[in-house]
């Protein structure tokens, strides 16, 4: 059934086959097990406890006959150690790979391996505690073998192997959760049947050998077993693995899995803040939450080294013990010293990844900077999370000593901590589902039916818009624009047309008076979208938005640390105080907002990062209040090259109207006495909005119908005709692409794969409303898109041309004069003009004349004529 474990050979010797170990009488239930003095009490050198020199997976156990099966002799399985037990899937069967001693739960799971040297003891009838010998005895006592077997416990714990397995089996067989459908997103869960038996059936159907165990379920069923799991996870989890594999292969003997089923606990009650982790949490199961800020490449970690003799080609394997390989020194076949070489392609490796988790702002103490924790992910957990994900991590808290450096084997007294990850969970009911390529979320059929029913209602567009920031009064068009931004357009890639891709993300800019709920709108979207980032223009730098190079403390190599725009890939980046950004910071947004990429060339690292990010920005006017006599460029002091990349620009102004003020005050006061029934309605609307947007983004890719194409063409031509007679430009191709994206998003609101005429009409209406507010020339009162694209309206451009001509005419009248006083020229131009000329307008015109080479401005007081 199972064989003695192999340990690294001494002097190159190969492991020998052990014999049966005689048992030591009937187990006594009255003998207590040596335990730690509390869950945080570690073994100290002063305790005079000698531990045998074996690795965690190299503990021998009583051998049994291979002819025994799984039926009548299940007690033989109960005697086996949880640390080196071969599950039924590996007992002389080829159903699952990694059979034999290497396929045991502990050896197959680097996430629960420990550097502690664990041993087991048998509770005998009259001699107290006896350690299980490392190798089997050469003699076998058939009389003792037929007697009742002793109980096996793990040294230093109260974990009795057989009891642990039997309790967990009872939990699997009997636990019924009436709220199972709310725990994990699964289909066909019967709340009246044992939950985890149904999950075993899912494992058999999907052939995914992982069982997610909710610790809250275990706590309600068996408090003692739950406490053992929290305090001694590296000893208890392998026991759970054994029990679940036995049950699975008893129910499905012909099942074929990639490897043995692994239990992954989550939702541990011992959830800690990162700052409160202390030494009493060492080697215990913890759960912490935060945001992933960095993940390394996959690192191969050697688990078993293969050595071959250079003389006689004799081979042997050595397990890696605490990160070290004890290379054999003597070949037992040819008796040659120092002749072994390491064969890498025959050694066994496991995947490993370093993940850095940052403290979430909600858990951060006042006046503190975010705290970071280092995570190690192994095997299938590698690449499960990406930078920007908000996760809850369940794992084992570890501490490793720091080396003094050099060739010395001594270590420092200061320890370095990390978490060996057992389970990742990306769940936040307040947010939308994360949009991952190639991965769809599973919606129950009744939920899909509800969403389809809602989509058929004629007012679904208005109802979803009202669900956006319901605490903010009115601003209906702004909420509709944000709603369309959350849905997004259709992702298209047409490399044959000369363009790599067409942008599907929608960008919004909110400008207006202070105190008009712009920041609250940004905060709502930030709390709604999973991959979202919130930053302020005053506190952001160019490298903070893009990426910066830092030295990895683990590998001591230069690595690229991504910024807010890259972390918000496939999400929304909310930028408040957009007008307060400096020019170098704003310049990085040009490529991101149009090409959806970010080019980096720093410290020898040249790459192009994906930044498929929707920008939602808010800006305040430079004069603290919107000046209606100035255009948007003069009010917010933003470059026109950046403004032209926004699909919708809304003005949020204070109307200063008594009726509006009364309605607004009534709405604000009503927020303070909201009833419970209204709160439940709000939560329901939030849940519906979350599922509705996620379903539309994943399953719909609307395309233009013939009617929609013709209407878009006509709308663009009409927009161009508006200012053609006056020399104004009222539309650019960017405005047409914005209309297409908005139309596709509106089709997603209807859960339709076809963009119809009504979608184009609503997109055109919303786009025109935004242009009426942001691109209206205050002098003429007409829409002039040139304000957004060139920074000047047609009237301002004509006024500057007239001013330049007047300056040239005045200089010609000077004759042979070489220099002209600055103030005198300004006075002459001002007196000769019929319209008012400001000093800023005069300086702009003078700069244009200087660019033509007609004059040279010398200092601030003199102008030299060329």
UniProtKB/Swiss-Prot annotation:
Q: What is its EC number?
A: 3.6.4.12
Question: Does the record carry Nucleotidyltransferase as a key word?
Answer: no
**Primary location recorded for the protein, binned into one broad class:** nucleus
Keyword Phosphoprotein (UniProt): yes
Q: Which residues carry this modification: Phosphoserine?
A: 55, 81
Chain residue ranges for the region called Disordered? 1-67, 81-107, 124-145
Residue ranges annotated for the MCM domain, each copy included: 460-669
Q: Which reaction does it catalyse?
A: ATP + H2O = ADP + phosphate + H(+)
Show the ranges annotated as biased composition (Polar residues): 47-63, 81-93
InterPro entries (alphabetical): AAA+_ATPase (IPR003593), MCM (IPR031327), MCM_4 (IPR008047), MCM_CS (IPR018525), MCM_dom (IPR001208), MCM_lid (IPR041562), MCM_N (IPR027925), MCM_OB (IPR033762)
Binding-site positions, ATP: 512-519
Q: Name one Pfam family in it.
A: MCM_lid
Organism encoding this protein: Drosophila melanogaster (Fruit fly)
Enumerate the UniProt keywords alphabetically: ATP-binding, DNA replication, DNA-binding, Helicase, Hydrolase, Nucleotide-binding, Nucleus, Phosphoprotein
What is known about its processing and modification? Phosphorylated by the catalytic component of the Dbf4-dependent kinase (DDK) complex Cdc7.
Motif Arginine finger, chain ranges: 644-647
So what family is this one in? Belongs to the MCM family.
Entry-annotated residues carrying Phosphothreonine: 87
Top EC class of this enzyme: hydrolase
Spell out the protein name for this chain.
DNA replication licensing factor MCM4
Q: Which GO terms describe its molecular function?
A: ATP binding; ATP hydrolysis activity; DNA helicase activity; single-stranded DNA binding
Give GO BP annotations, semicolon-separated.
DNA replication; DNA strand elongation involved in DNA replication; double-strand break repair via break-induced replication; mitotic DNA replication initiation; mitotic spindle organization; premeiotic DNA replication
Q: Where in the cell is it found?
A: Nucleus
Recall the taxonomic lineage recorded for the source organism. Answer: Eukaryota, Metazoa, Ecdysozoa, Arthropoda, Hexapoda
């Amino acid at each position: 059934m199972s064989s003695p474990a192999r340990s690294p050979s001494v002097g190159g010797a190969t492991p020998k086959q052990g014999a049966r170990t005689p048992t030591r009488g009937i187990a006594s239930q009255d003998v207590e097990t040596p335990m730690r003095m509390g869950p945080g009490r570690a073994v100290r050198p002063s305790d005079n406890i000698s531990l045998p020199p074996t690795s965690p997976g190299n503990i021998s156990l009583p051998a049994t006959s291979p002819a025994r099966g799984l039926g009548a002799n299940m007690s033989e399985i109960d005697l086996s150690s949880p640390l080196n037990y071969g599950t039924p899937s590996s007992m002389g069967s080829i159903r699952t790979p990694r059979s034999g001693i290497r396929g045991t739960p502990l050896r197959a799971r680097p996430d629960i391996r420990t550097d502690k040297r664990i041993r087991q003891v048998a509770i005998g009838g009259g001699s107290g505690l006896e350690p299980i010998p490392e190798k089997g005895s050469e003699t076998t006592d058939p009389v003792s073998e037929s007697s009742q077997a002793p109980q096996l416990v793990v040294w230093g714990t109260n974990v009795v192997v057989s009891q642990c397995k039997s309790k967990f089996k009872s939990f699997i067989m009997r636990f019924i959760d009436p709220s199972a459908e709310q725990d994990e997103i699964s289909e066909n869960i019967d709340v009246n049947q044992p939950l985890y038996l149904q999950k075993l059936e899912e494992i058999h159907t999907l052939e995914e050998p992982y069982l997610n165990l909710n610790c809250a379920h275990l706590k309600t069923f068996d408090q003692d077993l739950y406490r053992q799991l929290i305090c001694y996870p590296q000893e208890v989890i392998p026991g759970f693995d054994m029990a679940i594999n036995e049950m699975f292969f008893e129910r499905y003997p012909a099942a074929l899995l990639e490897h043995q089923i692994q239990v992954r606990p989550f939702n541990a009650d011992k959830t800690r803040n990162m700052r409160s982790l202390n030494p009493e949490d060492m080697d215990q199961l913890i759960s912490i939450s935060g945001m992933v800020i960095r993940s390394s490449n996959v690192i191969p970690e050697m688990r078993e080294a293969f050595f071959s003799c250079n003389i006689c080609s004799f081979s042997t394997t050595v397990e890696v013990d605490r990160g070290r390989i004890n290379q054999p020194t003597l070949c037992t076949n040819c008796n040659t010293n120092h002749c072994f070489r390491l064969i890498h392609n025959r050694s066994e490796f496991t995947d490993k990844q370093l993940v850095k988790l940052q403290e979430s702002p909600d858990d951060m103490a006042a006046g503190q900077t975010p705290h970071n924790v280092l995570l190690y992910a192994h095997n299938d957990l590698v690449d499960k999370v990406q930078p920007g994900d908000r996760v809850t991590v369940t794992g084992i808290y570890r501490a490793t000593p720091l080396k003094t450096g050099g060739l010395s084997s001594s270590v420092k007294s200061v320890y370095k901590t990390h978490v060996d990850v057992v389970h990742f969970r990306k769940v936040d009911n307040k947010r939308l589902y994360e949009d991952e390529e190639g991965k769809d979320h599973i919606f129950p059929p009744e939920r899909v039916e509800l969403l389809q029913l809602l989509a058929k209602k004629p007012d679904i567009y208005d109802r979803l818009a009202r669900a956006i920031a319901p605490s903010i009064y009115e601003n209906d068009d702004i909420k509709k624009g944000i709603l369309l931004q959350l849905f997004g357009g259709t992702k298209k890639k047409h490399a044959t047309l000369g363009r790599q891709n067409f942008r599907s993300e929608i960008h919004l800019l909110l400008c207006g008076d202070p105190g008009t709920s712009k920041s609250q709108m940004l905060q709502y979207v930030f709390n709604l979208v999973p991959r979202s980032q919130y930053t302020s223009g005053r506190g952001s730098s160019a490298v903070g938005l893009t990426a910066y190079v830092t030295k990895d403390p683990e590998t001591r190599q230069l690595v690229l640390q991504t910024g807010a725009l890259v972390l918000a890939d496939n999400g929304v980046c909310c930028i408040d105080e957009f007008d307060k950004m400096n020019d170098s910071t704003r310049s990085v947004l040009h490529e991101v907002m149009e090409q959806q990429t970010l080019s980096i060339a720093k410290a020898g690292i040249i790459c192009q990062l994906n930044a498929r990010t929707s920008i939602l920005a808010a800006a305040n006017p430079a004069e603290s209040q919107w000046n209606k006599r100035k255009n948007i460029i003069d009010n917010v002091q933003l470059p026109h090259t950046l403004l032209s990349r926004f699909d919708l620009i809304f003005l949020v102004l204070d109307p200063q109207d008594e009726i509006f003020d009364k309605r607004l005050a009534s709405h604000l006061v009503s927020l303070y006495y909201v009833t419970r029934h209204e709160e439940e309605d709000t939560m329901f609307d939030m849940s519906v909005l979350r599922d509705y947007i996620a379903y539309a983004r994943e399953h719909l890719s609307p395309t233009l119908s013939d009617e929609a194409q013709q209407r878009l063409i006509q709308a663009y031509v009409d927009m161009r005709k508006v200012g053609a007679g006056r020399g104004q430009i009222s539309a650019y191709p960017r405005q047409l692409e914005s209309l297409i994206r908005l139309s596709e998003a509106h089709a997603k609101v209807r859960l339709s794969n076809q963009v119809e005429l009504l979608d184009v009409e609503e997109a055109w209406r919303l786009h025109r409303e935004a242009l009426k507010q942001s691109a209206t020339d205050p002098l003429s009162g007409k829409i002039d898109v040139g304000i957004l694209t060139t920074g000047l309206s047609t009237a301002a451009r004509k006024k500057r041309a007239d001013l330049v001509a007047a300056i040239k005419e005045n200089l010609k009248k000077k004759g042979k004069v070489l220099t002209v006083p600055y103030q005198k020229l300004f006075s002459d131009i001002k007196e000769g003009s019929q319209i008012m000329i400001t000093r800023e307008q005069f300086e702009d015109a003078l700069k244009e004349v200087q660019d033509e080479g007609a004059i040279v401005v010398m200092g601030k007081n003199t102008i030299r004529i060329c």
